[in-house]
Curated annotation (Swiss-Prot):
InterPro entries for the chain: CusB-like_dom_1, CusB_D23, MFP_Efflux, RND_pump_MFP
Protein's UniProt name: Antibiotic efflux pump periplasmic linker protein ArpA
Entry's localization field: Cell inner membrane
Keyword Transport belongs to the record: yes
Its job: The periplasmic linker protein component of an antibiotic efflux pump. Confers resistance to numerous structurally unrelated antibiotics such as carbenicillin, chloramphenicol, erythromycin, novobiocin, streptomycin and tetracycline. Is not involved in organic solvent efflux.
GO molecular function: transmembrane transporter activity
Signal peptide (UniProt feature, chain positions): 1-22
Lipid attachment residues per UniProt (N-palmitoyl cysteine): C23
Keyword entries, A-Z: Antibiotic resistance, Cell inner membrane, Cell membrane, Coiled coil, Lipoprotein, Membrane, Palmitate, Signal, Transport
GO BP term, pick one: response to antibiotic
Family to which this protein belongs: Belongs to the membrane fusion protein (MFP) (TC 8.A.1) family.
Membrane topology according to the record: Lipid-anchor
Pfam families tied to this protein: CusB_dom_1, HlyD_D23
Length: 371
C-alpha cells in the first residue's frame, strides 16, 4: 500500500494534461467561413409580351367548279394540281345540241322580226289591229331573249375557272355526263397566296390581357401590334410576317375560345390549307418587367416557385414568388422580387434560410452572368 499516493498523482497528471490539450484544440479551431454564392441583381426592363396560339391554315378563296349546262365532257384542259388563271378553260362539254338551239333561235328571230316590221307598216294603213301588231312585236322580243339564252348556254359548254389558284383533282373524266345543279363539283380551286391562319385564344387569356392593358400593367405594342409570326409544325419560323385581320364577335360555346384570323403572304406556297401551326401575336409591352433566371427559381413541396436572395446584411432570405410564364431562359415574375434584389443563382446547395431574422450569412463573389 505504499504505492497508492504515487498512482493517484500519476492519474491526476494525465487528466490535467488531457484537459489542457482539449482546451488548446478548441482555441485553435478556426471559425466556419460564410459560403460564397453567385447572384444576379434584378433590374426592371421593357419586354414585349407575346402569345403563342394554335391554329390552322385555310385558303384565301375557294371555288367549286360546277357545270351550268347538261352534257357529255369531251375534254379536260388542265393538269391536276397545277395553277390556273381566272377565265381559263377547264373543260369542254359537247356543244352540238346548243349550237343547233342557237341556230334555231337565230332563224326564229329573223322570222319574228320580219313579221313585226310588216305589221308595223300594216298598222299605219290600218290593215291590222293594234292587238295583232302588239302580238307580233312581243314574239320578236321573245325570240331575241331566246337567242340570248341560246348564246349563254353555248358559252357555258366551255367550263371556265371562276378564280385564279391551284386546282385539285378532277372528279369527272372525258365521257362523263354532267348536269346543271348536280351536287358533286367537277373540281375545286383554292387561292393560296395570300393565305389565312385561324387561331383560337381562350376567353380567360383575352380577359386578362384586357385587364392588364386597362390597369396600365401592359401598354399597347405600338404600330406593329397587329403583326403576327408563324411557327411551322417542324418548329421553324415562317419567313413571311402576317397581319391580324379580325377576331370573332362571339365565343365558341363548346371550347370557350375566340377565333382570330391572320393573313399571310404565301408566294412560294409553303403553307397549304389544313396545316397545323402556331401564331405568335404581340399582346403588349411591360415597361418594368421583372425577369429572373430559371436557375435561380426553385419549387417548394407544394410546387410553388421560390427563390433565395441576399439581403443588405448579406443574409439569405427565402421569397415566395408568383411567376406567370417562361420567356426564353427567364421567368416573368409578377410578385416576390423587386428591383435591386440580389437573386442567388449559383451555390444554392451551400446556403439555406433559417428562422426569420437569423438567415445564414454568405459572401457574394463576382456577380453571376445570365445564361
Amino acid at each position: 500500500m505504499q504505492f497508492k499516493p504515487a498512482v493517484t498523482a500519476l492519474v491526476s497528471a494525465v487528466a490535467l494534461a488531457t484537459l489542457l490539450s482539449g482546451c488548446k484544440k478548441e482555441e485553435a479551431a478556426p471559425a466556419a467561413q460564410a459560403p460564397q454564392v453567385g447572384v444576379v441583381t434584378i433590374q426592371p426592363q421593357a419586354f414585349t409580351l407575346t402569345s403563342e396560339l394554335p391554329g390552322r391554315t385555310s385558303a384565301y378563296r375557294v371555288a367549286e367548279v360546277r357545270p351550268q349546262v347538261n352534257g357529255i365532257i369531251l375534254k379536260r384542259l388542265f393538269k391536276e394540281g397545277s395553277e390556273v388563271k381566272e377565265g381559263q378553260q377547264l373543260y369542254q362539254i359537247d356543244p352540238a345540241v346548243y349550237e343547233a338551239t342557237l341556230a334555231n333561235a337565230k332563224a326564229n328571230l329573223l322570222a319574228t322580226r320580219s313579221l313585226a316590221e310588216r305589221y308595223k307598216q300594216l298598222i299605219d294603213e290600218q290593215a291590222v289591229s293594234k292587238q295583232e301588231y302588239d302580238d307580233a312585236n312581243a314574239k320578236r322580243l321573245q325570240a331575241e331573249a331566246s337567242l340570248k339564252s341560246a348564246q349563254i348556254d353555248l358559252r357555258y359548254t366551255k367550263v371556265l375557272a371562276p378564280i385564279s389558284g391551284r386546282i385539285g383533282r378532277s372528279s369527272f373524266t372525258e365521257g362523263a355526263l354532267v348536269s346543271n345543279g348536280q351536287t358533286d363539283a367537277m373540281a375545286t380551286i383554292q387561292q393560296l397566296d395570300p393565305i389565312y391562319v385561324d387561331v383560337t385564344q381562350s376567353t380567360a387569356e383575352l380577359l386578362k390581357l384586357r385587364r392588364d392593358l386597362e390597369s396600365g400593367q401592359l401598354q399597347k405594342a405600338g404600330n406593329n401590334a397587329a403583326s403576327v409570326q408563324l411557327v411551322l409544325e417542324d418548329g421553324s419560323l415562317f419567313k413571311q410576317e402576317g397581319r391580324l385581320e379580325f377576331s370573332e364577335v362571339a365565343v365558341d360555346e363548346t371550347t370557350g375560345s375566340v377565333t382570330l384570323r391572320a393573313l399571310f403572304p404565301n408566294p412560294d406556297h409553303t403553307l397549304l390549307p389544313g396545316m397545323f401551326v402556331h401564331a405568335r401575336l404581340k399582346a403588349g409591352v411591360n415597361a418594368n418587367a421583372i425577369l429572373a433566371p430559371q436557375q435561380g427559381v426553385t419549387r417548394d413541396l407544394k410546387g410553388a416557385p421560390t427563390a433565395l436572395v441576399v439581403n443588405q446584411e448579406n443574409k439569405v432570405e427565402l421569397r415566395q414568388l408568383k411567376a406567370s410564364r417562361t420567356l426564353g431562359s427567364d421567368w416573368l415574375i409578377e410578385e416576390g422580387l423587386n428591383p435591386g434584389d440580389r437573386l442567388i443563382t449559383e451555390g444554392l446547395q451551400y446556403v439555406s434560410p433559417r428562422r426569420r431574422g437569423e438567415g445564414q450569412r454568405c459572401h457574394q463573389r463576382q456577380e453571376a452572368g445570365r445564361p
